[in-house]
A protein has these predicted regions:
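Charge-dense, helix-prone N-terminal extensions
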Residues: 1-4, 15-19, 40-47, 56, ...
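Conserved beta-strand edge residues that scaffold enzyme active sites
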Residues: 72, 146-147, 184
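Conserved acyl-donor/pantetheine-binding loop and adjacent beta-alpha core of acyl/acetyltransferases
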Residues: 56, 60, 69, 73-116, ...
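Conserved GNAT acetyl-CoA-binding A-motif
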Residues: 125, 132-160
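Active-site rim helix/loop that mediates acceptor-substrate recognition in acyltransferases
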Residues: 33-64
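C-terminal "cap" of GNAT-fold acetyltransferases
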Residues: 160-201
Length: 201
């Protein structure tokens, strides 16, 4: 398996993120704003407006996601943030809150065409978990599609429909299903264990 290196998206890595997303802003001018903005605002800022908003977030050192590198080139992205930062997710009727516990949400993946099929999704998830843990998170939540659901069973994975990830990748890393949001989509969680420092004897 190809070795990837993953890092939080900081202002120093903005040009790498911009090059990865390209002129299309990852997909249709999204720039990873679909879950961050109210739907009406997203429609207004789609494209260049979303690019500017993402840059402002990165420049403010809010580190809205993880970049994966193959060599010196960014080839993958995973969006992660505290759920309250994701306005559209908070307002979602399908992906509504399971409870009132504080969670960090993994919302999307974008992987360059040449890097697909190399196991990069799991690498990004691991880095996202570490990032959330370093920021004090106790629960990481994800909303992947379930390719084993009767409706999707036997179908070929589609990078667009699976932009929120696939359940099998999350299960491999210890996530558990807490709720079925729809026939094909799950809400999954990973409980992050607190590292307790032992007292010196």
């Amino acid at each position: 398996m190809t070795a990837f290196r993953c890092f939080p998206a900081t202002s120093e890595r903005w040009s790498d993120l911009e090059n990865l997303f390209g002129k299309n802003g990852a997909n249709a001018g999204c720039w990873c704003m679909f879950w961050r903005l109210e739907r009406s605002m997203f429609k207004k800022t789609k494209g260049e407006g979303n690019r500017q908003i993402l840059k402002q977030i990165v420049d403010a050192d809010k580190q809205p996601g993880i970049l994966a590198y193959e060599g010196n080139q960014a080839v993958g992205w995973c969006g992660i943030a505290p759920r309250p930062d994701l306005i559209a997710l908070e307002n979602s009727r399908i992906l509504k809150r399971v409870d009132d516990r504080a969670v960090w949400s993994i919302t999307c993946f974008f992987i360059s065409r040449e890097a697909r099929g190399k196991g990069i999704m799991e690498c990004l998830i691991k880095a996202a978990i570490a990032h959330a843990r370093s920021n004090g998170a106790q629960i990481v939540e994800a909303y992947p599609i379930d390719m084993q659901s009767p409706k999707l069973l036997g179908q070929v994975f589609n990078s667009y429909s699976g932009y929120m990830g696939v359940a099998s990748a999350f299960r491999t890393l210890g996530f558990e299903e807490v709720q079925r949001a729809s026939e094909t989509q799950l809400i999954m969680r990973l409980m992050i264990k607190a590292h307790v420092k032992r007292k010196a004897k």
